[in-house]
């Protein structure tokens, strides 16, 4: 399970250094193999260990290519999916087209989200956090049953 937000830097080649606290888990569970794709709802990237991504691929394969909405989701997620292998120094090369999509330059937030990471431009991440907090403070809609049962 991945949790927490960590500031990491992209080097001049577009590689990010995976924090050491995640490296052993990624090597053990995915032999360092990751898949990066776009987030279709936010200006960030999604970074999955390969076994987790294969579950997503199975779900995507069950969508209908005849349904325009389902086909669009398949096209966006699979069409942007890029495999990346963690090197011996614990770095991952993020494809240029993906970096461009998320506006990633130097400072990047690596955000743990259970079975995957989100990769955000640092400034965009903090703007999103502020928007999310503001939205929660002004909530007028009814919470879903699952959120009502969540006790923090």
UniProtKB/Swiss-Prot annotation:
UniProt cross-references to Gene3D superfamilies, sorted A to Z: Transcriptional regulator MraZ domain
Location, primary (coarse class): cytoplasm
GO process annotations (BP): negative regulation of DNA-templated transcription initiation
GO CC terms: cytoplasm; nucleoid
Domain spans labelled SpoVT-AbrB: 5-52, 81-124
InterPro entries: MraZ, MraZ_C, MraZ_dom, MraZ_N, MraZ_sf, SpoVT-AbrB_dom, SpoVT-AbrB_sf
Subcellular localization: Cytoplasm, Nucleoid
Coiled-coil residue windows: none
CDD domains assigned to the protein according to its UniProt record, in alphabetical order: MraZ_C (cd16321), MraZ_N (cd16320)
Keywords: Cytoplasm, DNA-binding, Repeat, Repressor, Transcription, Transcription regulation
GO molecular-function terms, A-Z: DNA-binding transcription factor activity; transcription cis-regulatory region binding
SUPFAM superfamilies: AbrB/MazE/MraZ-like (SSF89447)
Family: Belongs to the MraZ family.
Function description: Negatively regulates its own expression and that of the subsequent genes in the proximal part of the division and cell wall (dcw) gene cluster. Acts by binding directly to DNA. May also regulate the expression of genes outside the dcw cluster.
Quaternary data: Forms oligomers.
NCBIfam families documented for this protein: division/cell wall cluster transcriptional repressor MraZ
Entry protein name: Transcriptional regulator MraZ
Lineage: Bacteria, Pseudomonadati, Pseudomonadota, Gammaproteobacteria, Enterobacterales
Name of encoding gene: mraZ
């Amino acid at each position: 399970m991945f949790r927490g937000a960590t500031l990491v830097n992209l080097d001049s080649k577009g590689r990010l250094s995976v924090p050491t606290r995640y490296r052993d888990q990624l090597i053990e569970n995915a032999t360092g193999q990751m898949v990066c794709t776009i987030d279709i709802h936010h200006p960030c990237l999604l970074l999955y260990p390969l076994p987790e991504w294969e579950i997503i691929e199975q779900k995507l394969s069950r969508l209908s290519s005849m349904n325009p909405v389902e086909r669009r989701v398949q096209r966006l997620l699979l069409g942007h999916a890029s495999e990346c292998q963690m090197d011996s120094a614990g770095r991952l090369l993020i494809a240029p087209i993906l970096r461009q999509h998320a506006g990633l330059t130097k400072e990047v937030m690596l955000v743990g989200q259970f079975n995957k990471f989100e990769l955000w431009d640092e400034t965009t991440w903090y703007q999103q956090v502020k928007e999310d907090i503001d939205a929660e403070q002004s909530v007028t809609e009814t919470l879903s049953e699952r959120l009502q049962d969540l006790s923090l």
